[in-house]
Every structure is written in C-alpha cells, then in structure tokens.
C-alpha cells in the first residue's frame, strides 16, 4: 500500500500561496468574514469598525463529522470608508462586546457562554490592530459579558459568575446577575497572556439581564446596514454548489432553499427558507432539481413548541418555483446514481432506518428498503459520480454504529425487489480494528474496474487525534486499499476526476491529490481578498476548474494554474 502523510494544518492566519486562483466571487458582500453579527464598535478617529460574529455550526442531520476542531466565532476589523477587512481573529466562545482603546492601537474583546451544566466560560482578548494578533490575557476561563474603557489604563468589565453552583449549591438565578470590576494596567498594548488573575474580577454584584439572541443580532445587523448605506443581511453556509450545462451556478445555503446565478454573475432567482437547503440533485435534462431541506424536529415560536415536517422539494431551474414536495416521516440524506436513480435515507432513527428509492423520471418514492440505523457522524457516505448507490450499514442492527460495512443497493434486481449487497468493511486494517466514521467521496476508474475514493476519520475517546482523518482509495469490489492520505482536521467536502482529487478541510485548507497514486500535488489555505475563508462544499466543473462554497456564504469560481 502506497501512501502519503502530510503535516497538520494550523490555525495561524498566515497562509502559504498556491496555484488556486479565484476568478470571481458570487454572493460577496461587506462583513462576510464574521457570519451572523453579535456586536459592533466604530472608531471614527482610526476609521475602523470591529465586529464580532458567528459563522455557525458545520454539521447537519446528514453529516456531522466536520464539526471537530471547528471554532465558529470571529472578530473582524474593517475600514469604515472602504469596508475592507483588515484582520480576522478566531474566538473559542461567542463574542459579546468589543471596545477600541482611546489612544492605543488595540481592541478589547469580551467573549463567553454557559457550558450547559456548570461553568460560565469565556475570555478577555486584546487584539493588536497593527499585527492582527490576539492575546488571551486572563488566567482561567470566565465569561466576559461587557467591557468599556474608563481611561487609558482602566478597563471596566462585567463578568458572569464563575459557575451556577456558588457554595456548592445550584443557583437557578445565576444567569440573572453578574459582577463589575475595573482592571488596571499601565500599558494595555503590552499585557502578557494569562496575566489577569481571577481575583481581579471580584467586584460589585449587579443585576444583569442577558438580551435575547434575536435582539442582539438585529441590533448588530442594523449597525452594519447603517455603515453600508443599504439593507444588509448575513450569508452563511453554502452547503452545496453545482454548475449547469448553460453556465449557471446552482447553490443551496443557510436560509436559502436554492438559488441560481447567471453566467454574468448576476443573481437569477433565490428561494428563501428559514432552514435552507443542504443537498442538490439535478435531474436529467437539467429542467428541475431535488433539494433536501433541513428541518429541526421542533422549535419555539414565542412560548409555543412547533414541530416541523421533513422536507424534500423539486424546484424548477427556470425560475426556482417549487413544483412539488415529498411527504416524509423522517429527515433524509440524498444519494444519486449516475443514471438518475435517487435514494433517500432516513436520518432520525438509530435502529430502524429505511431507504426510499425514486426512479430517474419518477416524482415520488416507489420502494422502501430496510437499511438499519443512521447517525450523522458514523454513517454519512455521500458518493458522487457513482455507478452504484453506496451506503454504510452496521452489522449489528441494535448497535448500527459498530462494525460498519460499505454496501450497495440495486434498485431493480432480478427478483423485482431492491437488494442490499454487502461489499466490504469500512475498516480496512484488522490490526487497528478501529471505529471509523464515514465521509464524502467519489467513484473513479473505468467500467468494470471502478474504485472508491472517500474521506473519513478514526474515532478515539479522547476526541479527534492528529492524523486520524483520512482520504483513501479502495477497490470498489473488494475494498483493497490502493493509497491512504492522512490529515488532522475534518473533511468538509471532496470531489475530483481521474486526474486529481480535491479535498477541503474545516481548517480552511484545500489539498489536491493525484488520483492514481495518492501523492499530494499541492495544498493551499483558502483566502478571499487576503483574509481566511473555509470551504464547505466544492464541485469540479472541468479540468482545473472548481466551484467552492464557503462557510461565510460566498461562492468562489476558481481555476488551477
């Protein structure tokens, strides 16, 4: 077995250059880099604006393995006049407050959240406006709810209680109060990491009403709209992107069921949806497409708990009109075969899952096949350019995440009933005998000699360990491994052809691999206008041409030099 192991990706925003060139950007707008905004501060003297935001959770009901090692919160520094992004800083926790120092080129940032059971965690960051580097200056995690400069040396902060068990007893009112303190330093531009002690946060207790998230976001959106001088709203999560034969680009995104962009880069149509589309399957003739729409099992509307039905719709590619929808009793993930057969696998049953099959010209499922349980980390296996319908199935129906096999489903076997054929174990190394997660992939090779190239990860109780992410090429019939490439960060998307496999990671890195032998052609961290971006979806549209959908809602039309 030949293979290549490349070093881990890093979270530094100093990226190497590579051969990938962005030719045009669809869905671009100011403040894209920070996602959904949470707080805004403007400094007219410096001509800068600081924005805290949230890029969002990467998983959905059909694929959840790409959430590991993901930091979704951001602080962006922008110019007031040109709205160009100067710096982007990651945060481990939600960003509550940002404040420019009255004289020094720094910004103080307060972050944090409740861990759901005990502690109010967070940190105080100092961001250097000259270098873009950030320093966590407090020792120990503590949620910082608000901050403002009282003078050049004094920073007034409002912090949450350490935890919800003061004195060892649960306090149900802990979220209703906070403590205010003044931190003093002679030079805040030269404060060492971890030098602010927890006892410095001891101060006066006060009532503190945490604002509703919707109100916080609404105020921040209004502030950014005022800066742009026109209506503004965030874009996030381009979950799927594809190109039609006529050059149009079709995509689905957070809050967007589907949208179409003309070859000249102008938006042709857009169907809005509170949840948004997750998968696109373009039908033969390219007149319409199936869209898999994400729906939560239930949500609160005011004080009422509302249950939402799963949704898969068929839309016209001419105008985006919804032509019909499928009645479903479960959320699903879509898998398509090259000849047009479509499979819908149920995702919200851990033991009694099913597979529904739709003919290439069909309008609704005709057959259901028992396939066992599904969960988004273990069983996700979206294989593109495939001559078969591939899935992951657990040997033990009571514990379907264990001993998973790659199986294929024949929609029309000889006896007239759909057939599930067991192909080979997902785990190819009997000595390791690991618990493997699934991931995206493609089928390559000629007729009669087809191989699978797919991503995945080796599970460990300690979390995702370095080197436990993999991309592997395997015989489509027997599962024999031809090559393996390992990595440290989860795979968000994968596509390719007979020459090159392109793999996107949630670290922001894109890696090109020789399809034949697994050697790495090149690797490059994705940047847009000099700032980091994270690829979430990608499609090869031709030799050396890619469409990349980003976590921050942009679509990148790229070529490889």
Task: Pin down the residues of each PLM region.
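A short helix->beta-strand "capping" segment at the edge of beta-propeller domains
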Residues: 3-36, 81-83, 211-236, 478
């Amino acid at each position: 077995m030949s293979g290549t192991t490349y070093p881990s990706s890093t979270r530094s925003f100093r990226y190497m250059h590579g051969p990938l060139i962005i030719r045009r950007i669809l869905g671009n707008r100011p403040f894209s880099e920070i996602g959904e905004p949470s707080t805004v501060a403007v400094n007219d003297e410096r001509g800068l604006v600081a924005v805290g935001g949230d890029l969002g959770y990467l998983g959905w009901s059909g694929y959840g393995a790409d959430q590991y090692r993901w930091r979704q919160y951001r602080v962006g520094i922008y110019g007031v006049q040109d709205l160009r992004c100067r710096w982007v800083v990651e945060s481990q926790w939600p960003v509550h407050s940002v404040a420019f120092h009255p004289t020094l080129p720094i910004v103080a940032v307060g972050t944090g959240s409740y861990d759901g059971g005990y502690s109010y965690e967070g940190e105080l960051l100092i961001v250097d406006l000259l270098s873009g580097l950030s320093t966590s200056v407090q020792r120990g995690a503590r949620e910082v709810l608000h901050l403002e400069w009282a003078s050049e040396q004094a920073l007034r902060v409002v912090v949450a209680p350490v935890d919800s068990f003061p004195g060892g007893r649960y306090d149900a009112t802990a979220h209703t109060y906070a403590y205010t303190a003044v931190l003093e330093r002679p030079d805040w531009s030269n404060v060492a990491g971890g030098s602010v002690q927890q006892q410095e946060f001891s101060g006066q207790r006060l009532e503190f009403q945490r604002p509703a998230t919707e109100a916080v976001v609404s105020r921040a959106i209004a502030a950014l709209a005022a800066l742009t001088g026109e209506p503004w709203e965030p874009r996030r999560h381009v979950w799927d992107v594809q190109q039609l034969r006529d050059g149009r680009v079709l995509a689905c995104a957070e809050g967007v069921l589907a949208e179409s962009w003309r070859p000249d880069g102008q938006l042709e149509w857009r169907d809005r949806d509170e949840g948004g589309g997750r998968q696109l399957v373009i039908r033969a003739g390219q007149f319409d497409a199936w869209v898999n729409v994400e729906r939560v099992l239930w949500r609160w509307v005011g004080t009422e708990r509302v249950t939402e039905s799963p949704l898969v719709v068929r839309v016209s590619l001419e105008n985006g009109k919804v032509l019909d929808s499928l009645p479903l009793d479960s959320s699903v993930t879509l898998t398509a075969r090259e000849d047009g057969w479509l499979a819908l696998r149920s995702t919200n049953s851990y033991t009694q899952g099913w597979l529904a099959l739709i003919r290439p010209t069909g309008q609704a499922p005709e057959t259901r096949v028992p396939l066992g349980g599904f969960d988004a980390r273990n069983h996700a296996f979206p294989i593109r350019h495939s001559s078969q319908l591939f899935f992951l199935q657990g040997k033990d129906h009571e514990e379907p995440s264990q001993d998973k096999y790659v199986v294929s489903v024949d929609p029309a076997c000889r006896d007239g009933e759909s057939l599930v054929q067991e192909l080979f174990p997902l785990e190819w190394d009997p000595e390791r005998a690991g618990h493997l997660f699934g991931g995206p992939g493609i089928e390559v090779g000629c007729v009669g000699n087809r191989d699978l190239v797919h991503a995945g990860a080796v599970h460990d109780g300690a979390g995702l360990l370095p080197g436990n992410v993999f991309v592997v090429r395997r015989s489509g019939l027997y599962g024999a491994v031809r090559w393996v490439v390992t990595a440290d960060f989860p795979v968000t998307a994968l596509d390719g052809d007979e020459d090159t496999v392109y793999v996107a990671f949630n670290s922001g890195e894109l890696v090109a691999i020789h399809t034949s032998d697994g050697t790495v052609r090149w690797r490059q961290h994705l940047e847009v206008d000099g700032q980091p971006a994270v690829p979430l979806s990608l499609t090869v549209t031709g030799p050396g041409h890619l469409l990349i959908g980003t976590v921050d809602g942009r679509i990148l039309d790229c070529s490889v030099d």
